[in-house]
């Protein structure tokens, strides 16, 4: 039964971003949002509202646990059937894990309380990691990099790590650390929000710390300068993964 009232549904998905121009729909460029919209239009309604994502990942960036919502007139939508059909319709580098009815006050972007990213640095050349991890052969001091990472928690203005001008550059970074897994160095960072290119710039600057090109005092000065030109290089997008998005517990996702 359809009514004039719209009902909200949440999608949980994963994607490899190497062949896409990011999440947000664009003219004449393949995007994650664009591909899912095609599927929703095909199986539901040509006039179905735009799907809204938890964030706007850049070109080449991947996502392990991404959320988006859309609205539809029928609250009794067969979500299992839609899940099956969408996964058949979508390219292999996008997977829908679940589709659920959610309360009307939920918003995939604005209801999120934190987002977590991981950046993968491969210390060994591996053809199976092409467009999946950043290969970096030089030896890095992981202990120094973790000391520097911890300094990020005491600073909220992150404008040193983004070229874009923001009215609000304040980010509440809740955790930032490196760990090693076999031939991989992984940087994990969680915050309530992120600026454009912020994680990739932080990783590049921390690599400079690991190479001992800059010391811990230099790193602190870079943060406090609020000037992107003082920070290090931006690592490639293909090593970056949105690994999780957290929402208030009242939303059962």
Where are these regions (language model features)?
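Structured-RNA-binding interfaces characteristic of tRNA pseudouridine synthases
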Residues: 1-253
